[in-house]
Amino acid sequence: MKKNNLLYVLFGLAILGYGIFTYQFISNQIINYNAYNSKETKITINKPNNINEDGSFVLSNSTITKDFEKKDGVRTYNWYADPYCPDCIRIHEATHEYIEQSLKDGSIQIMFHPLNFTSHKSGEYSLTISAWVSGLADVSQDSEKVYKFMTKIWNNATKEDLKNLTDVSLEEKIVNIANEIGFSKKEVKQVSDNLKGYEFAINQASVNIRRMDKFKELSPKKDKSFFVPFIYGENGKALDGESEKIDSDILGPLKGLVPCSESCH
């Protein structure tokens, strides 16, 4: 009987120990989650300065904002891109001179949506770099600098240089690029300190975007799927980001020279 009592006691202690362990584990997860989203960690996902909660932001001739500024005669576009995506790089390289000039003269505003859309191929590359793009847009009011950083990032030579680096080496390279473009040490440190928050925003956006019905209406593809680069204006369907006819299918609509209905199909 004493032997059975001892077994019951040991069994009870085991259950109690497991219960305490489980409680502490769950409590720690809650604490860690709250800390991850608290002001103490300086993660800006809950209260971004210049960007939206999905990491998107608008570049114009004057500043960086969360939404388009209503101005007559200004063309507005949404631009979804992944820094690892070959077509995203190709389109950016072909259009960046026009976009840069149009941002300067105020004839165009673009809401950029950095994504982690190719994570199955790129590992942490797309996530890390997209987070840096959103982060720099969040801490800076200089739209010209941010677009120059994007042009350096959406570049084949840069991709080849960075894509196989470890996390630490990749961040060092990105920091060097940001410094060369002219971001202050304070701005760069702010992004580095808050990078997990920006990564969280990018990941959430990249997952949620696949569930949004609006892209089925905008997509020029037969299967109505979302793809990158996904670029669309206030009216019409998205441009054909996979097209080899850059002048007619991409630059033409961006310049307002070719109606989207003629090139986006």
Name the predicted role of every residue range.
Residues 25-71:
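N-terminal, intrinsically disordered, polar/charged segments of Gram-positive cell-envelope systems
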Residues 89-174:
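Structural alpha/beta surface segment adjacent to cysteine/selenocysteine redox centers
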